[in-house]
């Protein structure tokens, strides 16, 4: 979406109907049918299509669709095999890459004329309701093209997903006579999860903790960066959660109820950064002294650059000995392409370091 806005390209999406059933089975499979087949009961049926439920059906459909994209001239990228690219040219002669992004049976096409490109896929696969349209929802997130300061910017928000998750949890709590707490921040002030000595949960509540963390993790994937750190911390206790950990998960949902809206703007503009500190002065000298043989490693078989260039920026930080029991630190980072966040992450470090300097070098 960043590249689309940056290069003046359009987006179109489609959903393949009965996706697996379009692909041939990759294994020799058969079944002995039951009474529901009438006179054929007890007969041996040979399975020729990648039926839902077969272990290899997902791989069979993926390979079948990949073959179609390859015939169209698209090439799978080295970094992500489900991102396909093809060199395109605008009427004015400007070169760019067309992209097709695949997530199981969801297709997203980025091109100057995406309907023509995605229509070639439709020649072999039937789309649900024969619909090819700009994306509105993708994997639970609402996608919109908005104007900001005279620039078209793609956005994604998890508002609908969050509201549905909160409402579902409130219904479950209502059956127990409980309510979500009102919260102004994701985690209660002063709560230290590793020092919590409340009772351990039974099997039922243990499963509830795992389910709630799964729901929250997907909300993070859809842009709720503001709860990433807190959910990461509580995820450490999924093996043996306590009552206090469950209550803190309720606290996070209470925070989401109070703050359901958060929109990420994938701004294609290049950030204004002062890099002179790395080019001259004492900092540059220090880097040269410590990394005198350092060279930029570029991937092999890189495709020819086409379209406008982008700048990748990473912001990184780590605590030191934040865990009061293990003395382990916690790492967090956000990676931007131009001014659009694309990756955000928070995790506990696997080893213990003696200084803040060393903890900043670990993931």
Residue ranges and their predicted role:
Residues 1-363:
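Long, low-complexity, charge-biased intrinsically disordered regions
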